[in-house]
Amino acid sequence: MSDSVNLDEPSTNSTHFLQCLVTEPRKELQGSRDTHVSYLIITKTNLSIFTRAECKVRRRFSDFVKLQEILSRMNEDCVVPPLPAKHKLEYIKGGRFSDNFINRRAKLLNRYITRCALHPVLHQSPHFIAFLENPNWNNYVRFFIQPKLNNTSKLDEISDSLLNAFSKLKEEPTEFDIQRDHVQQFMFGISNLEGSIQKLLRLEKALESDYEDVSIQFDRLASLDQALDVPIESIQNALQQTGTEYANLTEKLTLLLDTIKDVESYAHSLKELLKRRDQKQQDVEALQEYSAKLSLERDKISSGGSNGFSLSKTLDDLRGIDHNDTRLKRLEHVQSELQAVEQAIQEASAVHDAFNQRVREESKLFDSVRQSEMLSAISDYANVHVEFFTNIRDLWIRVKQ
């Protein structure tokens, strides 16, 4: 996917763009306890919401984590792109400070920033803009953002989720049910593809090792008898270079695997958004159910209630309490509460309807980004194999000549 994002509708004549690039990873404070890697972020844009047309800042991974937290907490109706796993050490030798790991993480962070830049809501967030251009990001977070995050407690969000975790929707709209199934099937397919590629990686690594072993044996054979009338040295070199080609192929296939894992995480974010949509609907349904109970109670009080024996009524008689006055006060209280609940239903329904519309837009954006990224990854995969087999063919043609 291109790092340059056109932010205009097709029908507009002007061209607004936002170009973000994460590049040049650099190890900082090496040898100390605070050793870390910083990444250069270059932003070019003509959007008026930015203070500069071009800016460069350096951010470490923990800064990206904080940005992710801010965007997620303050944009609950959006699919906020996921960050790569903090310790993504599969297929890595040398740990998180190895060049291989650092370069792979830089590519994943670049995809993360590009996804945010593509998003019609997130790219306008003042916090995202500050991340891209504010040289004092840590102070910005400490004094302007952290107090807001503290006021919107994560515990409250978890509590709301737990309250709705054991309740089911009375009737889920068909369109969102279809979306959920679509995402689930996509994640299932991606998971199967990931497993197949991991299997292929193991086979290619084994071939790399086997070609290296055969190359060594040919080298030993050549040293035993220099008079052999066969191009043993050429064969040995071709075998060795074939192993090297497999090593290069494995490295590039690992990058494809990173992309697939990243797209799978992105799909999971959409799945979580659909869950939050369900919570909004459950809020409305719970209020409607409570309103129905209050209406029944109001009607019961209005009709005079039960004419049978009532212990509370008998006690009120002994105390000389006016039953009609008590009934009117109860009726007034229930009507007041019912009015408040009806107002809450209207507000919750408005939030629910707006959330539904946002989910529709997020789903379309996700499909667009997913298709673009997968098409790019598959195209790269094909080109890598064309290059691989071309190089292998050329190697052995030279041996034959």
From Swiss-Prot:
SMART domains: PX. Residues 190-292 form a coiled coil. GO terms for biological process: endocytic recycling; mitophagy; piecemeal microautophagy of the nucleus; protein transport; reticulophagy. A 1,2-diacyl-sn-glycero-3-phospho-(1D-myo-inositol-3-phosphate) binds at R60, S62, K86, R105. One of its GO terms (molecular function) is phosphatidylinositol-3-phosphate binding. Belongs to the sorting nexin family. This is Sorting nexin-4. It comes from Schizosaccharomyces pombe (strain 972 / ATCC 24843) (Fission yeast). The lineage of its organism: Eukaryota, Fungi, Dikarya, Ascomycota, Taphrinomycotina.
